[in-house]
């Protein structure tokens, strides 16, 4: 590869690596910080983000290294060449798990919480990663070209005894890449996801038509279903972008394998396809920010607080706080639940005591909608609520607003 072309390739790859790391760390940070985003679907989103972070930290540096054709032991070269296949497979499994999760949520919503639990999701994620390593590192178990070293190329690179010129196609057999990796482990899951999302949209369309035919359709049920469909569209876009980024490289591999007499793809085209495949690790955070309001708002808060160092004023509304009114015989009790703080506990470990106001209102932190009473009133600063602000308050019960951002979150 010419020095100029090599420099451009390395520069672009490094830029992609930085963006992939920063964007996907932001995704994981948002889920960790915002309790509204801590749901089963987003466990799989975090697994997908972890694979994309690993692409930026490891796979892209490995790809840059292997592009130089440096001399190495064959199995060491194999590990470097195959590691990106592990991460690709993990991404595919995460996308498939998300598609199935959304299918269950729309097809059998009443059984969703019983079937799809956090413990099961974490177990599925662990299994997906184990399978990804097994599939991606299969060439190291013997399905490789280490037994047929290309002596001429090795000598031209100045490689010593027992070393090979570390180039992807020289160590990884193309029949593995086409038959096993592409046809079995990439194309089949992509087709399954296509079928699952098609069924999701058909089922949602049928349910919406049934609601329209009812004399008094439930607006809340209709709104929830529409938001499920919106989330499914967002995730289907992510699957489509994955296919768009990875299929060109696999198509080039198919031409190389099925037409050995044809001229090999130009080197610039190969590197363009490789860069496109790595770009997939950058795009997902932008999709979340553009399509999902709760992610977008949390990204803004993280950037303002931790990057720009701007202090945001306290707001007792929106996604960071919720006011719940409980009506009693001796007045009204207003409780404030804050995201990011343990409900009903001060920072020093003591529980708050709701203070009785002269106007008959009490203020306290709640857990699950009930006030927590205890001795002591130190810790978080008091919050003043005026009685006229509470007149006519009639909050909706907490419920699903978006499957990717539950408990009060929303989508745009």
Curated annotation (Swiss-Prot):
* Topological domain ranges for the Cytoplasmic compartment: 33-42, 101-120, 199-234, 291-412
> Which BP terms from GO are recorded?
adenylate cyclase-activating G protein-coupled receptor signaling pathway; adenylate cyclase-modulating G protein-coupled receptor signaling pathway; apoptotic process; apoptotic signaling pathway; astrocyte activation; blood circulation; blood coagulation; cell-cell signaling
What keywords are assigned to this protein? Cell membrane, Disulfide bond, G-protein coupled receptor, Glycoprotein, Membrane, Receptor, Transducer, Transmembrane, Transmembrane helix, Ubl conjugation
Q: Which stretches are Extracellular in the membrane topology?
A: 1-7, 67-77, 144-173, 259-266
Q: Which GO terms describe its cellular component?
A: asymmetric synapse; axolemma; dendrite; glutamatergic synapse; intermediate filament; membrane; neuronal cell body; plasma membrane
Positions that bind adenosine: 169, 253, 277-278
Q: Which residues cross the membrane?
A: 8-32, 43-66, 78-100, 121-143, 174-198, 235-258, 267-290
What protein does this entry describe? Adenosine receptor A2a
């Amino acid at each position: 590869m010419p020095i100029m072309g090599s420099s451009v390739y390395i520069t672009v790859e490094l830029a992609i690596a930085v963006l992939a790391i920063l964007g996907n760390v932001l995704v994981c940070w948002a889920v960790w910080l915002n309790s509204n985003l801590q749901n089963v679907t987003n466990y799989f989103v975090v697994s997908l983000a972890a694979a994309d972070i690993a692409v930026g930290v490891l796979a892209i540096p490995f790809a840059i290294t292997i592009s130089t054709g440096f001399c190495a032991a064959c199995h060491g070269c194999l590990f470097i060449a195959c590691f990106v296949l592990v991460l690709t497979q993990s991404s595919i499994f995460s996308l498939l798990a998300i598609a199935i999760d959304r299918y269950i949520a729309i097809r059998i919503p009443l059984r969703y919480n019983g079937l799809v639990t956090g413990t099961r999701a974490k177990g599925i994620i662990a299994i997906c990663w184990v399978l990804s390593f097994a599939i991606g590192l299969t060439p190291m178990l013997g399905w490789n070209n280490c037994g047929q070293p290309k002596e001429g190329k090795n000598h031209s690179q100045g490689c010593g005894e027992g070393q090979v010129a570390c180039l992807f196609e020289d160590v990884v057999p193309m029949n593995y890449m086409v038959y096993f990796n592409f046809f079995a482990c990439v194309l089949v899951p992509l087709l399954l996801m296509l079928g699952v999302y098609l069924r999701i949209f058909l089922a949602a369309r049928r349910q919406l038509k049934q609601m329209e035919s009812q004399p008094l359709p439930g607006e809340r049920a209709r709104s929830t279903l529409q938001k499920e469909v919106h989330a499914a569209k967002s995730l289907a876009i992510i699957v489509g972008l994955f296919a768009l980024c990875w299929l060109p490289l696999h198509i080039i591999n198919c031409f190389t394998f099925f037409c050995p007499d044809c001229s090999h793809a130009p080197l610039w085209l190969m590197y363009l396809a490789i860069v496109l495949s790595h770009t997939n690790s950058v795009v997902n955070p932008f999709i979340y920010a553009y399509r999902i309001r709760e992610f977008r708002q949390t990204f803004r808060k993280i950037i303002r607080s931790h990057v720009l160092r701007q202090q945001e004023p306290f707001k007792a509304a929106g996604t960071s706080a919720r006011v719940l009114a409980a009506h009693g015989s001796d007045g009204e009790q207003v409780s404030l639940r804050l995201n990011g703080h343990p409900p009903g506990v001060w920072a020093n470990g003591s529980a708050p005591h709701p203070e009785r106001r002269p106007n008959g209102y009490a203020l306290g932190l709640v857990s699950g909608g009930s006030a927590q009473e205890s001795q002591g009133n130190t810790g978080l600063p008091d919050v003043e609520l005026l009685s006229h602000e509470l007149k006519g308050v009639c909050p909706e019960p907490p419920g699903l607003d978006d499957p990717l951002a539950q408990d009060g979150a929303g989508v745009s």
